[in-house]
Amino acid sequence: MRMYLVGSHATGKTTLCRYISRRYGLPMITEMARAVLAEMEASFDALRTDMDLVSEYQAQVFARQVAVEKMHRGHFVSDRAFDNLAYAAEHTTIAADLMASPRFAEYMKWVSDGLVFFLRPHPSLLRDDGVRAGVSWESVLRIDGMIKLMLEQHRISYLPVESVSMQERVRAAEFVLARCGVEARPKQPIDGENGHDAARTLAREFMTALGN
């Protein structure tokens, strides 16, 4: 089973993805952007002003996403899919070339056969993580709109997730996965020292990753 959480930056995708991965024992594919940025030994500030560099960066991020998914043989949860192409449209001049490629068409069909959750933005989730484009409400809305356009253009069925409540997001994911016959791992006890440690760990992860 392939499960995707798509949406703009600062919508809580990674937080929910991490929970689903742990709860259902699914391999987690997290965003390729940070890894590619580190490999290129580049900074986000450099990407802002170097068009060739940012074009290479976005092309590599998309290629890496496709390659890593194939390595997992179609069994994973990912905190994004084609999302970076919205950023390519926002910051580069190669978006048309990327979207005209056979690989893009094949990938969108591949995504359409998975479970797609579309996490919508909310001002309360804005947080600057020092990696992605300036975390402004206007930027978030532009990326959100482009991702929705691509979902609709390619007839990809998706579940919109409007709530910012982690509990409600978890319930939405659990409902869909249960209807798909995916069983969760047994829950850890919440009483006792181990239970408190697990609760503290989850709370800490939620607070640190909420903006992803």
Regions found by a protein language model. Give the residues of each.
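Pre-Walker A (Motif I) flank of P-loop NTPase domains
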Residues: 1-2
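A glycine- and Lys/Arg-enriched "phosphate-lid" helix/loop adjacent to the NTP-binding pocket
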Residues: 93-165, 170, 190
